[in-house]
Regions:
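Conserved SAM/SAH cofactor-binding pocket of Class I
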Residues: 46-129, 135
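N-terminal auxiliary segments of SAM/dcSAM-dependent transferases
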Residues: 1-24, 36
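A short, charged helix-loop
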Residues: 26-32
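A short glycine-rich, Lys/Arg-flanked "PGG" loop and its adjoining helix->strand segment in the class I
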Residues: 141-148
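Class I SAM-dependent methyltransferase Rossmann-like catalytic core
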Residues: 32-41, 49
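Residues at alpha-helix caps and immediate loop-helix transition turns in enzyme cores, especially N-
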Residues: 42-46, 139-140
Length: 148
C-alpha cells in the first residue's frame, strides 16, 4: 500500500531528514519524516512564502494540515504571543510536529484531527495552511468551507 502525506496511519518505514531554517533573527531545527508533507532536507517554497509574508490578525492561530510543523512552529518563534494549534490527520505528522516543537523549545497545541473534527468548535483569528492539494478538490474545498 502506498502512503500519502494525508494518510491517517502511514505504514511506510520511517526515514528522517534533519535541517535548519533561518528567517529574520530566528533559526529553527526540524526533523522531516517519510510519509509526512514535506519529506525533504529543506523547507518547501510554498511554506517559506507563507512564513515570510504572514502578518497575524489576532492571537489565536490554527495551522491546518501541519505536517512536521514547520509553518506553525516558525510563526510561533516569530510571534511568541500567538496561541497556536497545529492539526493534522496523519499520526506521524502529529508525532513529529510535537517533537519539533520540543526540540525548538516552543509551546504549541498539537492535535490529531480530520480537518476540524477534533478541534471542539474552537475559533481562530487566522488559519494557515499549505493545502493538501494531492488529497483532491473535495478535501481542499471542505478545508476552506469549514473554516467559517
Amino acid at each position: 500500500m502506498n502512503d500519502f502525506y494525508y494518510s491517517e496511519k502511514p505504514t511506510s518505514p520511517i526515514r528522517e531528514k534533519e535541517f535548519a531554517v533561518a528567517w529574520k533573527n530566528k533559526e529553527l531545527h526540524f526533523i522531516s519524516v517519510s510519509g509526512v508533507f514535506s519529506f525533504d532536507d529543506h523547507l518547501d517554497k510554498a511554506s517559506r512564502l507563507l512564513i515570510e509574508n504572514y502578518v497575524p490578525s489576532g492571537n489565536m492561530v490554527l495551522d491546518m494540515g501541519c505536517g512536521y510543523g514547520a509553518i506553525g512552529l516558525f510563526l510561533k518563534a516569530l510571534y511568541p504571543q500567538l496561541v497556536l494549534t497545529l492539526a493534522d490527520i496523519n499520526e506521524r505528522a502529529v508525532e513529529y510536529a510535537q517533537k519539533n516543537a520540543e526540540r525548538n523549545n516552543l509551546w504549541v497545541n498539537v492535535v490529531k484531527s480530520d480537518l476540524y473534527a477534533a478541534l471542539n468548535g474552537n475559533r481562530y483569528h487566522d488559519i494557515v495552511t499549505n493545502p493538501p492539494v494531492a488529497a483532491g478538490k473535495k478535501v481542499v474545498t471542505q478545508l476552506i468551507q469549514r473554516a467559517k
